[in-house]
A protein has these predicted regions:
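Structured-RNA-binding interfaces characteristic of tRNA pseudouridine synthases
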Residues: 14-294
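N-terminal amphipathic/basic-hydrophobic helices that include classical n-h-c signal peptides
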Residues: 1-17
């Protein structure tokens, strides 16, 4: 708490480059994922960077804790970005001096001038221009070396399944409608074999992955309410489409297509073809990103 107050005081007293941490929620249904792409503006990162440019007049890169795929949602995505307030202050002063004789409103290239903003003001500004399916939940000054992805020590994802015979048309973008009951006990047994540190190459959607595919899953938890089943995955990091492939494999276990003890052989195979299919994107939520307390 003391360090957080110190960072906020530094921001208020005019420190130059400030690092900001934001927590975001979004409905990924109509977006092509987190990462900005040159051929579309339908990305979460792209929307946020457009608004920061509107606010500062500068190109500001936003770093996300993870690149959620198209159609994937987030309740607790974490991102960070830097703003050089000293630089902006100097630029604004020059622009105002240069355009001293111009009409009101032409002296600054940014829509809203007026110096540095507090974290709350930044959050308010961003939310004013974000579409209704994206929101910044919190904004705070972060340590200089904080990076939303590189500083993360754990993440929790949730996959939502609907096992009822009739699909809920109003929840179709947030649940994978299976239309059949699953053997959850068998799925829990299989999940027990997935926890711990393993080489998850068989559960990686990137066949050209050259970096280590070893990850640690701390726990896999199941919450069932009626015909709805939520599966929570917590680990130190996840490979591309890993949670969706894990879910697809656990579904096959629940359907009786795959014995729980086959999980060990799937891990040992280190072959994507050995695991089950990738579950659809719409059922997946990034729930939480954890960091070391300092």
């Amino acid at each position: 708490l003391a360090e957080k107050l110190q960072r906020e005081r530094a921001a208020e007293t005019g420190a130059g480059i400030m690092n900001y941490k934001v927590v975001m929620a979004y409905d990924g249904s109509r977006y092509n994922g987190w990462q900005k792409q040159g051929n579309t503006d339908k990305t979460i990162q792209g929307k946020l960077e457009q608004i920061l440019f509107k606010m500062t007049g500068e190109e500001i890169e936003v770093h996300g804790s993870g690149r959620t795929d198209a159609g994937v949602h987030a309740r607790g995505q974490v991102a960070n970005f830097h703003i050089d307030w000293k630089k902006l202050e100097v630029q604004e002063k020059r622009e105002l001096e240069k355009n001293a004789g111009n009409q009101a409103g032409q002296g600054c290239k940014r829509e809203k001038c007026g110096g540095k903003k507090t974290p709350d003001q930044i959050m308010e500004y961003i939310n004013e221009y974000l579409p209704e399916d994206i929101a910044v939940l919190s904004c705070e000054v972060a340590p200089e070396r904080f990076h939303s992805r590189l500083s993360a020590v754990r993440k929790t994802y949730c996959y939502q399944l609907e096992m009822g015979p009739k699909k809920d048309v109003f929840q179709r973008n947030y649940y994978y409608g299976l239309g059949e009951r699953l053997d959850v006990s068998a799925m829990k047994a299989a999940a027990g074999l997935l926890t711990g540190t393993h080489d998850f190459k068989s559960f990686c959607g990137n066949k050209k992955m050259k970096k280590s595919t070893v990850r640690t899953i701390e726990k896999i938890e199941f919450e069932q309410s009626g015909s709805r089943l939520h599966i929570y995955f917590t680990g130190n990091g996840f490979l591309q489409q890993m949670v969706r492939i894990l879910t697809g494999t656990l579904i096959e276990v629940g359907q009786g297509k795959c014995a729980p003890d086959k999980i060990t052989r799937i891990l040992d195979a280190q072959d994507r073809q050995a695991a089950g299919p990738s579950a659809p994107a719409q059922g997946l939520f990034l729930v939480n990103v954890g960091y070391e307390d300092k």
